[in-house]
Design a protein with these regions (language model features):
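Conserved, structured core segments of small domains
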Residues: 1-98
Length: 98
């Protein structure tokens, strides 16, 4: 299944010192999930600080484990909203049956 994972700060925005201490761990951990095929796509949010991941997982709970396992999640700095997504099923009504 595919799950949209939309980040938000779990508490007040981290200080520059907190951010600078964790980013050297966050980036490689995120890239590993991408290279492992867990994160299919990733975007930077334009309306607020944060990211959006399209995650391949067996369930929403599995997606939660993956993204909360990232260093910012483990440090309690980042939380996510999780939205399971799939094919646009109503389009099937537009296909003529023979």
């Amino acid at each position: 299944m595919k799950v949209l994972c939309i980040s938000k700060w779990a508490k007040a925005r981290p200080s520059p010192e907190e951010r600078d201490a964790i980013l050297p761990k966050e980036v490689p951990a995120t890239l590993k999930l991408y290279l492992d095929g867990v994160i299919e796509q990733m975007w930077f949010k334009l309306d607020a600080p944060g990211v959006v991941f399209l995650v391949n997982a067996e369930s929403v709970d599995a997606a939660k484990i993956h993204v909360h396992g990232l260093p910012m999640g483990q440090a309690g700095l980042m939380d996510f909203d999780f939205i399971p997504v799939g094919p646009l099923a109503p389009l099937g009504m537009l296909i003529a049956e023979k």
